[in-house]
Amino acid sequence: MAKYDYNPKYGLENYSIFLPFETSFDAFRSTTWMQNHWYQSITASVVYVAVIFTGKKIMEKYKPFQLDTPLFVWNSFLAIFSILGFLRMTPEFVWSWSAEGNSFKYSICHSSYAQGVTGFWTEQFAMSKLFELIDTIFIVLRKRPLIFLHWYHHVTVMIYTWHAYKDHTASGRWFIWMNYGVHALMYSYYALRSLKFRLPKQMAMVVTTLQLAQMVMGVIIGVTVYRIKSSGEYCQQTWDNLGLCFGVYFTYFLLFANFFYHAYVKKNNRYTEVKKDKKEKEEPVDFEILEPKEDINANIAEPSITTRSAAARRKVQKAD
């Protein structure tokens, strides 16, 4: 269960500027609610999967919606939210491992971030995983490919985050800080993409590389916590949550590594947008819209996605 570990060196006392809703945050009320309702993340996940696949089936009868402006607004909102969360979590995060008497071990074993300013942004982080499911609604309505990596990632992140929040998992400060930072870049990238900006391939590679680094760090932290707890020392993370941690981060690493390989390393990769103008270079798409061409309606006036090799594409072009 959650352990309150308030340290007067952090929280409101560690911030020169704070917002009204941060000072009024009630950690006890928030934690109690999550302990009584965290399992609803599983219910929400089941409903989510049913809705998106039903929606995908229904959309087969309709043309894709043009949602560039709403998509830009949505991604911009999530980018700003993530930037604020990252900035507000950073002072306590740095203090947790760099202040006198603190260490990396302290930062992953003491949940002193669960109240005050960081407590508020931790709660918002957990709740945001529910609202981020809206990402998939845009994919379905725009008839973009819906891949396993996308919906699996959304579902498991939400369930794990809610489970970790109810226990005040100490290593969560690392996961939250990293995720806020990666999402700040990722959603900013998506916002620009929604405005049809031509962005260099390196930007997508940076986002994916940071996502992979996040997974590697998650596994390292999990192993460290396991060793500490196995030695009989105190570390605020339940065995159940630690098991979930290993499971989700290991599978994320495999999935994102597979995506990175096929999108940026392997020649004639599966994840390529084929441009109508042959003078334009083919460029990899982000993991939000990856899928073989067969899943796309042939009448959609958008760049298609193909799994064919370069040789196969040349044959088709000659036949035309």
From Swiss-Prot:
Q: What is its EC number?
A: 2.3.1.199
**Enzyme class, spelled out:** transferase
Transmembrane stretches, start-end: 33-53, 67-87, 120-140, 145-165, 203-223, 242-262
Predominant localisation class? membrane
Provide a GO CC annotation, any one: endoplasmic reticulum membrane
Q: Name one GO molecular function term.
A: fatty acid elongase activity
Looking at the keywords, is Membrane present?
A: yes
Residues in a coiled coil are: none
Q: Which residues are glycosylated?
A: N14
Compartments reported by the entry: Membrane
From the UniProt record, give the pathway where this protein acts. Answer: Lipid metabolism; fatty acid biosynthesis
Which lineage?
Eukaryota, Metazoa, Ecdysozoa, Nematoda, Chromadorea
| Annotated function | Could be implicated in synthesis of very long chain fatty acids. May be required for normally rapid growth.
The UniProt entry's sequence similarity note says: Belongs to the ELO family.
Extract the PROSITE patterns matched here.
Answer: ELO (PS01188)
Q: Which domain of life is it from?
A: Eukaryota
An example GO biological process term is:
fatty acid elongation, polyunsaturated fatty acid
Q: Which PANTHER family match?
A: ELONGATION OF VERY LONG CHAIN FATTY ACIDS PROTEIN 6, FATTY ACID ACYL TRANSFERASE-RELATED
Q: Which organism is it from?
A: Caenorhabditis elegans
What keywords are annotated for this sequence in UniProt? Fatty acid biosynthesis, Fatty acid metabolism, Glycoprotein, Lipid biosynthesis, Lipid metabolism, Membrane, Transferase, Transmembrane, Transmembrane helix
Entry membrane topology: Multi-pass membrane protein
Name recorded for this polypeptide: Putative fatty acid elongase 3
Give the reaction(s) catalysed: a very-long-chain acyl-CoA + malonyl-CoA + H(+) = a very-long-chain 3-oxoacyl-CoA + CO2 + CoA
